[in-house]
C-alpha cells in the first residue's frame, strides 16, 4: 500500500454527554474528502482512540469509511494492550475496507515492554493482520521509544510497510530513513498517475437489479423493456516499487522530513488546517523551495501551540474555528479557558481552511 503525502489525523466529535456524535464525524470526513489530502487516520491519538471502547471503535471505523471518498487512503488506529485485542480491531478495519492499520506500543505493563517483548508484539500483530501495518512511535504518550535498530529489523517483515515517527526528533527521523534503506522493496498498485489505489476504489461497482430502468414503448420496436445500467468501467492501474515508508508526525518538521526522504506526514494539525499542510507538500513537489519554506514557517507557531501544548482540546477548538466539528474532548481531558480560545483564534487568523 502506498502511504505518501499529507494525512490528517482526524478528531472524534462527541455530544455534550460524551457519546460519539457520528453525524458530525460523517460530515467532517465528507469535507476532508473534498480536500487534496492523501488520506485520513481514524482513531489515532488525535481521535482519542484510548477513550473509546471496542463497540464505539468499530462503529467509528464504519461511519468514517462510508463517508470517505473512495480515493482517500484510510488508516485505522488499532493499538491495544494485547496482541489478540489488536488483531481483532485489525479485522474490524479490514471489514470496513480500510487500507492499513496504525499500531502503537502497549503501555500498561511498561516495565515489561523490553525490546524483545515489543518486537514480538509487532511481529505477532503483523503475522495475522489482514491489513498492512504501520508502526507508531509516539514517546510523548507511550513511555517507550521504538529503537531505530528494531525498526530496521521489523522493516523486513512483509506486512510491516512503514512507521509514523511522532518523536519530533529530526535526527531520529533521518536515522529511521537511513537504516531502512535496505528493507525489501514492495510492489504496490497505483493509478496511472502513480497515486494510491484504495480498497474502496477496487470495490465491485457492477449494476444491481434495482438499478434497472424502464424504456418507453415508443422508443422501441414494440413493447416495454427493462434496460440495466452497464457496469462501471474497470479501474485502470499500474504498479510501482516502494521501500519502507517513513512519515513524520510533527508538523514543525514536515518540510525537513520530505527533503530528507520521508514519504509524507501524518498530522494532527491537518485536522484543523488541511490546506495549510497540503501547501507545504505541493510546493515541495513542485521544487519551489522558497514557497515550501514560507508555507512551513506559516504553520510553525500555530501547530506547536495548538497541537503540542494545548493538546486534543486545542485541536478540537481549532477545528470549530475553521469550520469543522470539533467540540470537547472526553474527560479527564479538561476544556480550554477563554484566553486559550482567543489565542487559537489569533494563531489561525491567517490560516483559515
Language-model segment annotations:
Residues 71, 157-158, 309:
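Acidic-histidine catalytic/liganding microenvironments
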Amino acid at each position: 500500500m502506498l502511504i505518501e503525502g499529507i494525512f490528517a489525523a482526524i478528531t472524534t466529535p462527541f455530544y455534550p454527554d460524551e457519546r460519539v456524535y457520528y453525524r458530525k464525524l460523517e460530515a467532517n470526513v465528507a469535507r476532508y474528502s473534498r480536500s487534496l489530502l492523501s488520506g485520513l487516520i481514524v482513531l489515532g491519538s488525535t481521535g482519542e482512540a484510548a477513550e473509546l471502547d471496542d463497540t464505539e471503535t468499530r462503529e467509528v471505523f464504519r461511519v468514517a469509511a462510508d463517508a470517505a471518498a473512495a480515493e482517500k487512503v484510510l488508516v485505522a488506529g488499532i493499538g491495544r494492550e494485547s496482541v489478540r485485542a489488536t488483531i481483532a480491531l485489525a479485522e474490524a478495519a479490514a471489514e470496513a475496507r480500510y487500507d492499513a492499520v496504525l499500531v502503537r506500543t502497549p503501555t500498561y505493563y511498561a516495565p515489561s515492554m523490553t525490546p524483545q517483548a515489543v518486537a514480538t508484539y509487532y511481529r505477532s500483530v503483523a503475522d495475522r493482520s489482514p491489513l498492512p501495518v504501520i508502526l507508531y512511535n509516539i514517546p510523548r504518550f507511550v513511555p517507550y521509544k521504538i529503537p531505530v535498530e528494531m525498526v530496521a529489523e521489523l522493516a523486513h517483515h512483509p506486512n510491516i510497510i512503514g512507521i509514523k515517527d511522532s518523536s519530533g526528533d529530526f535526527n531520529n527521523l533521518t536515522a529511521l530513513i537511513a537504516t531502512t534503506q535496505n528493507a525489501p522493496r514492495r510492489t504496490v498498485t497505483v493509478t496511472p498517475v502513480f497515486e494510491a489505489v484504495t480498497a474502496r476504489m477496487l470495490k465491485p461497482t457492477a449494476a444491481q437489479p434495482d438499478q434497472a430502468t424502464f424504456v418507453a414503448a415508443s422508443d422501441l420496436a414494440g413493447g416495454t423493456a427493462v434496460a440495466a445500467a452497464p457496469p462501471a468501467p474497470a479501474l485502470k492501474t499500474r504498479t510501482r516499487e516502494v521501500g519502507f515508508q517513513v512519515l513524520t508526525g510533527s508538523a514543525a518538521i514536515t518540510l525537513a522530513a520530505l527533503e530528507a526522504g520521508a514519504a509524507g506526514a501524518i498530522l494532527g494539525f491537518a485536522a484543523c488546517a488541511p490546506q495549510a499542510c497540503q501547501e507545504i507538500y505541493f510546493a515541495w513537489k513542485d521544487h519551489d523551495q522558497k514557497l515550501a519554506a514560507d508555507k512551513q514557517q506559516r504553520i510553525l507557531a500555530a501547530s506547536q501551540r495548538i497541537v503540542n501544548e494545548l493538546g486534543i482540546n486545542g485541536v478540537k477548538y481549532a477545528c470549530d474555528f475553521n469550520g469543522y466539528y470539533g467540540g470537547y474532548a472526553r474527560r479527564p481531558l479538561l476544556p480550554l479557558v477563554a484566553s486559550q480560545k482567543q489565542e487559537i483564534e489569533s494563531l489561525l487568523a491567517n490560516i483559515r481552511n
